Regions:
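Class I S-adenosyl-L-methionine-dependent methyltransferase catalytic core
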Residues: 1-69, 73-223
Length: 223
């Protein structure tokens, strides 16, 4: 699809209410995200495939020796992830930074992003989910988050109201910290019925490390 065809497709959204499924990603965000994850996971750029485009059918793409790095419709993300997991497709996908996707916490890894203003004007708390990481459950890289947000806006920070051993994607502040999959105790919804989106009960040690990372980044932390 050419740039002109892409712009023409985007134009039909102009007079409609904006939703995350109507978003299209600024080129500077695409390039920055690709650079970061190609470096983080040693991805060969020639192997990247972007199956989510007007008229595309991700279920019938040829994924042989490919890695998906794309921004899919968020409303279909759980179905897409399940399809890729079932078929052994490697992926790094944009996702809603508040809700995440499915509760496959033993299989997926979330990279904290930030608020991105998409080219249709929608402001979306954007994170990234992948199945290419066997040990880390949540990765927070302050430099990545800061630079991502500066590409389109100044962004905002989320106020955390959870205990030191509780975490959700939306409450991970911009700092340098990694949660290992082995440090997850259980899904947070087993003890916090008021919690929204992907979240975990984690070990005290992981919570203390997170506190220290946030303190170094200049945030007020939990006791």
């Amino acid at each position: 699809m050419t740039d002109e065809e892409y712009k023409a497709w985007c134009a039909h959204f102009d007079d409609r209410p904006k939703t995350t499924d109507d978003c299209y990603t600024p080129r500077q965000v695409i390039d920055f995200v690709e650079d970061y994850f190609c470096s983080y996971y040693n991805i060969d750029r020639s192997k990247i495939i972007r199956p989510f485009y007007p008229g595309g059918d991700y279920e019938h793409e040829d994924y042989t020796d490919k890695v998906v790095l794309d921004n899919p419709p968020f409303s279909l993300l759980a179905k897409i992830v399940q399809f890729y997991q079932k078929n052994g497709v490697k992926f790094v996908l944009y996702c809603n930074g508040t809700t995440g996707t499915t509760k496959m916490h033993g299989l997926l890894t979330y990279h904290i992003g930030g608020t991105v203003i998409y080219e249709n004007g929608a402001r979306v708390n954007t994170a990234f989910v992948t199945n290419m990481n066997e040990t880390e459950a949540i990765v927070s890289d302050r430099d990545f988050s800061d630079r991502l947000e500066k590409l389109t806006n100044k962004g905002t920070r989320v106020k955390c109201q959870y205990e030191i051993d509780e975490i959700t994607l939306a409450t991970v502040k911009k700092c340098d910290w990694v949660l290992l999959k082995s440090e997850i105790i259980e899904d947070i919804h087993k003890t916090r019925k008021d919690s929204f989106g992907i979240g975990y009960k984690i070990t005290k040690e992981a919570g203390i490390r997170r506190n220290e990372a946030e303190r170094k980044a200049g945030y007020v932390t939990r006791n």
